[in-house]
Structure formats: structure tokens, C-alpha cells
Amino acid sequence: MNATDLLNHPYYDRFKDILSDPTNAWIERIQDAGKIEEGLVTMYNGLKVYKDCYYDNFSDIFWLNGGVHEPQEEFVFHHILRGIKNPMPTILELGSYWAFYSMAFMQKFPLGKAFCVESDPNFMAQGQRNFALNGFEADFTCGFVGNNGIKVDDFCAEKGIERLDILHSDIQSFELEMLYGAQKMISEERIDNIFISTHTQELHYACLKFICDNNYNLVVSIDMNESYCCDGIIVAQSRKVNHTPYNVARKGQRALWTDEQMIAHLEAKKNPLI
């Protein structure tokens, strides 16, 4: 990839947002983070993924940004993992696609359990491949989450899940329906940590109200105008958890990188695609 390729990349504007995020400087990366070898990319935490596993060439952000694709969310997720004391915790990832967050969870907790739900069978296959690549196991379900599909309360009952250490949801505008379908688990505080990607401002604040109305403590709320990752982000914790709010960087607090800075960053990389 040269400068012209970068400037004409279909995801260039997204890449500029991500690379401009000051949160990048706060994420600890292993030495080989972003390295491509034999069609695999090393993520910031050492996980391996297939280099085109996430929206094809959007995956270029993996090597451009040292194995990080959503700095704000990944930073908070990493610190939430560090706060989990249960040696055998459980994660439910809704909209799992390439299953990165579930893999990061299993990397931290080898005795844990991961349940992954994805509506697109082709996307789900990417997550299954990545899980197998890293030697992890998960319970994969292909299905739609929402009022007319899978409901968290019913899913947990069917799978025998008594409590969730993490509920992670990125389901493309069905997040409020997801919360309604998790009402029992949430009201009984059987979900310790909730991560929600939001896809409109209206949904963001509706989800935020639901979370607060159910007496969860807010860890971070980043609406779509403040996000470097395109989606809004809500992270909340049960009152049973030692609450730790995070003050992450927000878009608009500083200027985005210029084209010249983007090109300089590209040239500074040991570009694995040349």
C-alpha cells in the first residue's frame, strides 16, 4: 500500500478517525502487534486473526493501527477484564461476527465460557475460524436478536446460564430490543458488565435511559458524535460490581489527523503489504 492507495481507500475516513484517537496511546501492544504473516494478523493482545476476516479490506486497520480497530471500546474492555475476579466467567457476545471480544475474554480466562450469537452465517463462520485458529472453544448460535428473534432472558434459560460476567452487544440498531429481552437478567442484576454498541443518537440515549432506570452504574457513555469508532458506546456495571468509571478520549476534543499525518504514519510503518 502506498500513499495513493491509502488516500483512495474506501474506509479512509474511518481509518482517519481511528488513528486520530488519543486512546491509542493508552493501549498496551505486544511487540508484533499489527504484523501480517501467512495471511494472519497479530492483534494488540497477541491474538491471531485472518487478515480479511472483518469486512474484507476494512481489516487493513489491523496492521495500520497495531492490532487495534476500536480504541475507545478495546481500552475499556481490557480494563473490565482485569477487574473480573471469577476464574470461570461467562461472556455472551451478540453480533459476534469475527468474535474478537469473546476471544479476548477466553484469552484472559481459559476456564471461562463464551456464547456467540450472529445472524449472518457467513460472518459467524469467520468467528468460528478465528476461535479455532487460537485454540479456543465457544458455543455459536446463528440467529437474529430482537423482539421477533432471540431474547437474552430466554437464551440464558435455555443454555443454563445463571449469570453473565459480560454481555457484549453490537447488533446494528436492535440494541434497545435486546435490552427489553434481557429485562429479567438485568433487573435481577445477573449481568455484571454490559457493553452496547449504539447505531443512532436516539437509540444511544434510549439505551442509556434503560440502563439508568434499571439502576446500573455507568462506566462510560460515548455517543455517535463523540466516537472515533463510528458506533456509540455504552458500558455499564451492576451495583454488585466494584464500579470503575473511565474518562476516555472523545472525538471533537482535538483535531483529526491531516492527510499528511496519515501518509507519514503509513510510511513509518514497516508495511507488511509491500
Question: Can you say where each PLM-predicted feature lies in the sequence?
Answer:
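S-adenosyl-L-methionine
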Residues: 1-117, 120-161, 218, ...
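Glycine-rich phosphate-binding loop signature in dinucleotide/nucleotide-binding domains
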Residues: 83-87, 156-164, 188
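Conserved S-adenosyl-L-methionine
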Residues: 95-98, 168-172
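A short acidic, amphipathic alpha-helical/loop segment
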Residues: 104, 154-155, 178-185, 206-210
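Short, conserved loop/helix-junction motifs that constitute active-site signature segments
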Residues: 108-109, 184-191
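Short acidic, Gly/Ser-rich segments with clustered Asp/Glu that frequently serve as metal-coordination loops
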Residues: 172-178
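Conserved beta-strand signature within the Rossmann-like core of class I S-adenosyl-L-methionine
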Residues: 190-199
